[in-house]
Amino acid sequence: MSEKKPNILKRFWQWFRKPSRMAIGTIIILSAIGGILSWVGFNYGLEKTNTEQFCASCHMQDAYPEYLHSVHYQTRTGVGASCPDCHVPHEFGAKMKRKIIAAKEVYAHYTGKVDTLEKFNAHRLEMAQNEWARMKANDSKECRNCHNVDRMTFNDQRSVAARMHQKMKTEGKTCIDCHKGIAHQLPDMSGVESGFKDEK
């Protein structure tokens, strides 16, 4: 009488418990393929969520129209900055931290906290202060990806702007201290520090 073969699950378990060279090789290859696919998918997701179109999908009624009338969108040279240029850091660690915070913001939109212009405006100061604090903490790094105070020609600026830019280094100020509202409508600024005090 012939021996009965163990069922397929039992055979797989035995194969898995006593891995041969082929089994180990298969596991390594499948793990490598899985890792590559995960990395590609992860980067694809990062790129898709780093576009102006993605940002506008939630901000079509509030922040996006304001941006379209800003100096960062309409420029005499045609060189502009899109949403991720200002709101998403370039460095990987800082970018991941910002993406986690952005996920909370997307959640707030879809759960109805800021899904209308009225609700958005009610939370505008809170959201703006969070963004200003982030920019202050990183010395307005996203601004400095394009703007370099050391390369500014102060003679071509209005006198007050030239004075302020020259004082930045000595007073420990950064771009966002004076340039709040550069791309979006300002909230009610009662009690909010506006930036440099110009002393002539």
From Swiss-Prot:
Instruction: Kindly state which keywords UniProt assigns to this record, in alphabetical order.
Output: Cell inner membrane, Cell membrane, Electron transport, Heme, Iron, Membrane, Metal-binding, Transmembrane, Transmembrane helix, Transport
Q: Which residues lie on this side of the membrane: Periplasmic?
A: 43-200
Give the residues the record marks as binding heme 1: 55, 58, 60, 105
**Residues engaged in binding substrate:** 99
Binding positions for heme 3 per the UniProt entry: 143, 146-147
Xref: SUPFAM superfamilies: Multiheme cytochromes (SSF48695)
Q: Please give the GO cellular component terms listed in this UniProt entry.
A: plasma membrane
Which InterPro entries does this one have? Cytochrome_c-type_ET, Multihaem_cyt_sf, NapC/NirT/NrfH, NapC/NirT_cyt_c_N, NapC/NirT_cytc_sf, NO3Rdtase_cyt_c_NapC/NirT
One Gene Ontology MF term: heme binding
Q: What is its main location?
A: membrane
The reply on keyword Repressor is no
Question: Which amino acids does the record list as binding heme 2?
Answer: 83, 86-87, 184
**Membrane topology term:** Single-pass membrane protein
Q: Is the keyword Transmembrane assigned to this protein?
A: yes
Q: How is the protein modified post-translationally, according to the record?
A: Binds 4 heme groups per subunit.
What GO biological process, any one, is recorded here? anaerobic respiration
Which Pfam family is an annotated match for this chain, by its short name? Cytochrom_NNT
Q: Which cellular compartments is it found in?
A: Cell inner membrane
Q: Which residues bind heme 4?
A: 175, 178-179
Q: Which residues lie on this side of the membrane: Cytoplasmic?
A: 1-21
Span-the-membrane segments of this chain are: 22-42
Q: Which family does it belong to?
A: Belongs to the NapC/NirT/NrfH family.
- What function does this protein fulfil? Mediates electron flow from quinones to the NapAB complex.
This protein is called Cytochrome c-type protein NapC
Species source reads Haemophilus influenzae (strain ATCC 51907 / DSM 11121 / KW20 / Rd)
Q: Which gene encodes it?
A: napC
